[in-house]
Design a protein with these regions (language model features):
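Active-site-adjacent substructure of cysteine-protease-like catalytic cores
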Residues: 1-71
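Noncatalytic regulatory segments and standalone regulatory/sensor domains
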Residues: 37-51, 58-139
Length: 139
């Protein structure tokens, strides 16, 4: 995620995640700081486990862990912004719930080919996302 965020601050990222692995909205600043300092993973359990689109905007690194700042469309959970351990956000992105996850990188059309090369060079898979919707028949 940090690699994607470092590519271009003007390129919004939209992540398709499973919320189950995330910390719950009641995580406090002390838990966040402990994670940054020691890697402790003592945050609250997730509030729910559903497929959800979010906007990761920053990664803060500490001596023991990293925290992803995630914008969200549900202001009731974290006021529209959550602070999540990077390892939990990665698990949410993997979507171990049997569904597809991933990150949509939004850029100007003229930059798409270069972005695709940059992402592939970082070892990321670049492809169309299949949400399971059947393709329309051609006849």
């Amino acid at each position: 995620m940090a690699d994607l965020l470092s590519l271009d601050a003007q390129m919004p990222l939209i992540a398709n995640i499973d919320t189950g692995p995330l910390w719950g909205a009641s995580a406090d600043r002390g838990q966040v700081q402990r994670h940054l300092d020691t890697g402790a993973d003592d945050g609250p359990a997730a509030d729910w486990s559903v497929g959800h689109f979010t906007n990761p905007v920053d990664v803060q690194r500490g001596t023991g862990g990293a925290i992803v700042t995630v914008r969200d469309t549900y202001p009731a959970l974290g006021g529209g912004i959550h602070l999540q351990p990077a390892s939990r956000f990665a698990a949410a992105l993997r979507r171990d719930d049997g569904r597809e996850g991933g990150v949509l990188c939004v850029c100007d059309a003229g930059r798409a080919a270069g972005l695709e090369r940059d992402l592939a060079a970082r070892g990321l898979q670049v492809r169309h996302w299949d949400n399971g919707t059947p393709e329309p028949s051609s006849g």
